[in-house]
Amino acid sequence: MFHFSGFNMMFPEGRNFHANYKCFSVSMLPGNERTDVEKGGKIIMPPSALDTLTRLNVEYPMLFKLTNVKKSRSSHAGVLEFVADEGKCYLPHWMMENLLLGEGDILNIESVSLPVATFSKFQPHSTDFLDITNPKAVLENALRNFACLTRGDVIAIKYNKKVYELCVLETKPGNAVSIIECDMNVEFEAPVGYKDHSETQASGSGQQGAAGTVGGEIAGATNAILEEVVETFKGSGVRLDGKKKKESQLETPVVKKVLARGVPDYDFQFGLIRFDRNIRPISDRSQEDDAVAGNADASDAESFHGTGFSMKKTRK
């Protein structure tokens, strides 16, 4: 049996990476503006970190645990580039808010190995997220710029020039998971501030039923019904997405038309169809026809009062 101890010395097993850096937001990065870093969940580290990671034989993909020791807050992220100044690292703004970090604070970075994600659940922080037609497709496209997810983090995604914040409520199989080349099921919780109006609609239908019974009891008061003024659509409108409607102040107020309630037919028999028409008796119709004919004869008799003449004289 042969032992290759020298082989193991040439290729040592991977060890963890530990380092402390001064953290800054991406807006402080020298050079051109890096909007792509703000859209994702990856950080920028100095070149010396790459040399150390290579010598330690760290597993790929490179994932890191970020810890703010003073505030006891931690999160996870991937690395985008190794172009930062020595002793500094640059983070997205939303990640610094999660870790309660300020510009120049000390951040502890440690290399970790995370399980591949199988399930995650998100909760939007605004009801405006309901305006998105296909939220799963938008989230899938945004998560391409992320390397991992941590339970409890509030991530920020940008869509149609608007930033949406989502809280990571649940991740499986662990509290922190890798989302690189994974097949992950996604669910959404109701947004913060969203109210379900099904109960209010049910109570409104109950009030309408009660109003119908009361109307049957006062059916005999015809005079009161004629004088009663009805105002249609007294309730307030409700949006399907749960947001409040925008109140627009008009310069000239809209005058509502007042409609008077009509008198119902209380002698109506169920199953009987009536076609009411203005039908005149036959005797009245015949008298009118005779009168019209007499007037026509009289007008014919009174016509041509003069004598007639012939163009051709008759021979005697």
UniProtKB/Swiss-Prot annotation:
Q: Name one Pfam family in it.
A: UFD1_N1
Q: Which UniProt keywords apply?
A: Ubl conjugation pathway
Q: Name any Gene Ontology BP term.
A: proteolysis
CC terms in the record's Gene Ontology section = proteasome complex; VCP-NPL4-UFD1 AAA ATPase complex
| Region: Disordered, residue numbers | 284-316
Single Gene Ontology MF annotation = polyubiquitin modification-dependent protein binding
Cross-referenced InterPro entries: Ufd1-like, Ufd1-like_Nn, UFD1_N1, UFD1_N2
- Domain of life (superkingdom): Eukaryota
Family recorded in the similarity comment: Belongs to the UFD1 family.
Tell me, what does this protein do in biology?
Answer: Functions at a post-ubiquitation step in the ubiquitin fusion degradation (UFD) pathway.
> Know the name of this protein?
Ubiquitin fusion degradation protein 1 homolog
